[in-house]
Amino acid sequence: MKKLSVCLLTAVLSCWCAAAFGWGKVGHDAIAYIAECNLTPKAKKNIERYLGGRSIVYYASWMDQVRHTPAYKHTTTWHTNSVDAEGNYVPDPKGDAMTFLDDCIAKVKDYRNQDDSTVRVSIRFIVHLVGDMHCPGHVKYPWYKKYKFSLNGAEYNLHNYWDEWALTLSNKWHYLEYGHQLDRCSKREKREIAQGTPRDWLADSARDCRVIYDWTKADQKLSYEAVSYTHLTLPTTS
């Protein structure tokens, strides 16, 4: 596998995270699908060789599925990133998405000196982590845990809401439909979005995701109109 394959994979994944903006399985599948559609044939072939011929979409939520198993329990904290009040990255001593993503990228780039299983698992992690680091509920500001709200009588915290319900309660699309609706950038726009490093993308994500604390106040009671409002005001790639 050429280094270009992993660089291209992480770059194209970053392009489509802001468009989905609330994850769960459908969101992760949509991000991976759109990214896959923008891979070069050579990069796609190289990646799928390590994945046993499977699509990256197949493994988009794999990291969520294995986090509760004994072998991967140590990855529980590796889905989120903490930032300070100004949105600056604060590394977690227990590990976080950014530290783990950097490690996975380094291993895939060094594929000649890694066994196939290490490269394979690292690719699976990259596909998931680039999505996680762009999700509003996975950017942890200092006041992160204080935010709980009720929506039509059901209580949510922001992590739970943006992980699953932001998509489930708005458009009930399949990941292919998200691909058709959101994969509309020009080549120039794609290049601009994919510029920088994962740490740059985290800084952008922290800045863009802070708005959720303006939309939803702690202990606020909301109706489903709020779901429609957040959906209509989300950034798009069109």
Please report, for each region that a protein language model flagged, where it lies by residue.
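Domain-level detector of nuclease and nuclease-like folds
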Residues: W143, K148-Y229
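Acidic/His-rich structured neighborhood in mature extracellular/periplasmic domains
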Residues: T69-W165
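Bacterial N-terminal signal peptides that target proteins for export
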Residues: M1-L8
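An N-terminal structural lobe/cap that precedes and organizes the functional/catalytic core
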Residues: F21-G95, L101-C104
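Structural motif
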Residues: G24-V26, N113-S122, L222-V227
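Conserved small/polar residues in nucleotide/adenosyl-binding loops
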Residues: T230-T236
